[in-house]
Amino acid sequence: VVDIVDTFRNNIQGATK
């Protein structure tokens, strides 16, 4: 399970969006 990585990437994408 990669919840941290998923959330991290999602956070970056959302912030960069």
From Swiss-Prot:
GO terms for cellular component: cytoplasm. Coiled coil: none annotated. The keyword Calcium applies. It is found in: Cytoplasm. Keywords: Calcium, Cytoplasm. Involved in calcium binding and microtubule stabilization. Belongs to the TCTP family. This is Translationally-controlled tumor protein homolog 2. It comes from Pseudotsuga menziesii.
